[in-house]
Amino acid sequence: KKIFFLAGFPRAGNTLLTSILNQNPDIGCTPNSIVLEIYKDVFLLKTKDIFLNYPDHYSLDNVLDMIYPVYYKNWNFKYIIDRGPAGTKSNLYLLKKHFKQEIKIIFLVRPLLEVLASWITWADKTPNNFIYQCTENPTEACHYLMKDGNQIMREMNCMQNLLKPE
């Protein structure tokens, strides 16, 4: 099985692309995947007292090496596309160290003003949405969406990490 990654700006067509790709019987494309979260949680065990009492890095690294193969063991597809923030610094570090295939990330982009406009349009049509629970008008909503740590900036940072020369 070949595993690829899908990431990108929100409102850039990730869901549409996933839907199209899943029409091919050889491709299994996930919704937002938990596998990178599993990587993070297992890796962070290295900071816990129980691990530090007997720090067997080699064995825990073996577990990290096997997360992707074991997670997708029963997926009957030639190609699996794992959708998630593969471009964050910490996720890239873990993938480079423990993912035993060539890392290929499909990263969808869309002009930033279109992303913001799409969010605002969605928020206007969606009662009790998270954007208008935190803000009072479209201008505040745009500032909120662009805030460091929120989804747009996280993905912009991912793109920046992916474009850095090695």
Task: Please provide the spans of the model-predicted regions.
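Secondary-structure transition/hinge residues
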Residues: 25, 72-75, 160, 164
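A general structural signal for short secondary-structure junctions and capping/turn motifs
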Residues: 70-73, 97
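PAPS-dependent sulfotransferase catalytic domain
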Residues: 79-166
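Electropositive, surface-exposed helix/loop patches at the edges of structured domains
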Residues: 66-68, 147-148
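PAPS-dependent sulfotransferase catalytic core
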Residues: 1-67, 74
